[in-house]
Amino acid sequence: MSDSSTIDLIIAAYQPSPEINPDISLPSILPVLISSIQTNSFLDESLAILIRTLHLRQSKASLPSLSPHITVPLCGLLPAVASSHSDPLTRHQAFRVLSLLLGASEPQLRFRHLVELTSDSELPQMRVASVGLVKEALLEALSLPPNDENIFLTSLFLHSFGTILFRPNPSDLFTSANLTLSDFQESHEPQRLVECLSLYYVLLLRDKNNLVCHLTCL
């Protein structure tokens, strides 16, 4: 990062404008944020800017979805930080930013990102945690008036997520003769299955109109 970029980042983090417009400020500082995350430089400042800006944006219900030019690169970088950074607080903040960012994304992109996160075997911690992000998106969709254009309330939801979330990984997990109880307990799969069953319970409880066709699509 250049000296001027660092100065811009520090000013944005510690002296934010009280009348900041998130749809103007984010695109202008995006290259600096991306560089900061990629190099692990001034990461606390970058996450603070993103949390504050996205939270402010979330409070303005009339704003449209964020541009993919913003959401796609950040959603590509943040999962690794949220999964493997050495500082637990940084991991938590990165995950919070990812949640806010997905909530501000176009629905189709949010859907695609969640499919990728829940099926990414290279980031097992995120594969578990992202089930909660799917639940968050589903509950948000179910809280809105029925809309045929909401991708989370169509049969595509279980066509896409059913084989990822509602089956063990690997598929022969419980029939394998080589699996021991200790191996199973030490893996990420028990926690992932608990999260998936929690999501399915929410789906059964809240989707009273069978909008995602949950009884016939599995």
Place the predicted regions along the sequence by residue:
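Alpha-solenoid helical repeat scaffolds
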Residues: 1-112, 128, 132-136, 141, ...
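Short linear, low-complexity motifs centered on an aromatic residue
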Residues: 110-120
